[in-house]
Amino acid sequence: MSRAAGSTETLKNRFRTDYCGLLNPEVEHQSVKLGGWVHRKRDHGGLIFIDLRDHTGICQIVIQPEEQQLFAKAEQLHLESVICIEGTVVRRSPGAVNPRIPSGEIEVVAAGISVESSAHPLPFPVADEVQTSEELRLKYRFIDLRRDKIHENIIFRSRLTAAIRRYLEEKSFIEIQTPILTSSSPEGARDFLVPSRLHPGKFYALPQAPQQFKQLLMVSGFPRYFQIAPCFRDEDARADRSPGEFYQLDMEMAFIEQDDLFEILEGMFSHLTGSMSTKRIREFPFPRISFRDVMNRYGTDKPDLRIPLEISDVTHLFLQSSFKVFAANTKEGCCVKAMLVKGRGNESRLFYDKAEKRAKELGSGGLAYIQFREDGPKGPLVKFLSGEELAALRELLGVEVGDVVFFGAGKWEQTCRIMGGMRTYFSDLFTLDRDELAFCWVVDFPMYEYNEDQKKIDFSHNPFSMPQGEMDALESMPPLNILAYQYDIVCNGIELSSGAIRNHRPDIMYKAFEIAGYTKEDVDSRFGHMIEAFKLGAPPHGGIAPGLDRLVMILRDEQNIREVIAFPMNQQAQDLMMGSPSEVTPIQLRELHLQVELPKKAEAKP
């Protein structure tokens, strides 16, 4: 992506009349003023060349020795100093053309230089993007943001946000800002709390998401809402999750069914990919996979569909097996899983030892496998299986000579997740297409799950989702068989968002919570304001909230979320540039009626 793309407007004043990256042979012989940063400086045989950089790109400036005062001033320039240049645009000679930059056919012969800000020595170079520690980059983020890659990431993010707004406005969505100071909720992640000066002992919370507000907007009669919403969660950092603050495309629609929302989202992602990226969508409409199916086939509810491996259920092959480990896991709630890896049956022992080590890290007791070689099946499992079982396995999986089959056995969910982890581990054997976007919807999540620790039925995901079958399902079906109108959208193994068709009926909500062990009084005390709103006329509604940061990561091929955020925190939730979090004065604490009590370990620090 060129920095210059879309930059056509120029304010003409004493600092500049044009942008560096937009100059071309059409303005040859014209006088221009440019302002920017000294990107590079070279002295070639009496001529000084300056690469001047602004937001749009780079333009080469030539200072000729005949201009003695100008030449002397140019000699004193430091890298990253801010200067303004006045000069004339000329064509470069054919041998001097630089095809790597948009302005590479021209250069500007300087007639005047003014130094607006002379730069001191830099903590790290901008022009040569050498490896620099993340700590230093975050401390001097304003320097880091001058570097091409991250600068372009931030420009891309801005344009993506604008494209999202245009698309949704064309679909009759209304952008509405919801409160930043709201009430704390015990559910979900930890809140960031803000003490109230006017109400001693009480606290606001920064919103983890505008969930309740957007549902109340549906009750208010707004048919389609969206917001590029800041969200705050006091949680640990990961490569794809920023601690503290993140942004999501928050959406909600009234009078819709699940398929309506899918159509809107698929259209938007298709539009954004086609107009802003060279990537391509693997399958459209996006495939829809039930939670049960996605766990059985991929071992995760966030599958990377580019990985050419699938998990197979082979439980039925071992119902009468003499191999007790497999036979014992054919009972209800357990399973035997197999994964065929083509062409890897002749790998070294080290290959299998490393795989087994990874399986143990995932929680398995080991990793059983069978190598299908020219001289017959080999491996630690072969002696325990009959010829009939091996033949049935070959036929079911389509095994050929040179292949290997890995196995897992145990409780269903744990076995699925271990095999899914091994599927991801073996993905390194393949070259995945980085330009392919393998979207999918994961649907039909279970409404409830059994809590082994508390020996009770619990909600498995979102308690405010509408159960499939509504009240009839709650009254007539075993709780663990009830499905919810909940869905995730996943791309290349990254969950972009969860969403749901909401439960807007108080009678169904009370019943759903009753099954999970909550009384009507419990529900009213926790969610009374929502229940009251739903009693006063609530339409059917549903929504979703894709993470903006993660979407930019995918489209820009970034592995670290901090590469797509202008001013991120580090992994310890610290802003190294601004020095936050920081201590506050005793006066500020007294105004808020607060007293700080540090943990003993922290008090001991000098």
Curated annotation (Swiss-Prot):
CDD domains cross-referenced by the UniProt entry: AspRS_core, EcAspRS_like_N
GO molecular function: aspartate-tRNA ligase activity; aspartate-tRNA(Asn) ligase activity; ATP binding; nucleic acid binding
Residues the record lists as binding L-aspartate: E187, R233, H461, R502
Reaction(s) the record says it catalyses: tRNA(Asx) + L-aspartate + ATP = L-aspartyl-tRNA(Asx) + AMP + diphosphate
Residues annotated for ATP binding in this entry: R233, D234, E235, E495, G547, L548, D549, R550
Pfam families named among the record's database cross-references: GAD (PF02938), tRNA-synt_2 (PF00152), tRNA_anti-codon (PF01336)
UniProt keywords, alphabetically: Aminoacyl-tRNA synthetase, ATP-binding, Cytoplasm, Ligase, Nucleotide-binding, Protein biosynthesis
Principal location: cytoplasm
GO biological process, one term: aspartyl-tRNA aminoacylation
Group of enzyme by EC: ligase
EC annotation from Swiss-Prot or TrEMBL: 6.1.1.23
Location of the protein in the cell: Cytoplasm
UniProt-annotated stretches for the region Aspartate: 211-214
Family per record: Belongs to the class-II aminoacyl-tRNA synthetase family. Type 1 subfamily.
Protein name: Aspartate--tRNA(Asp/Asn) ligase
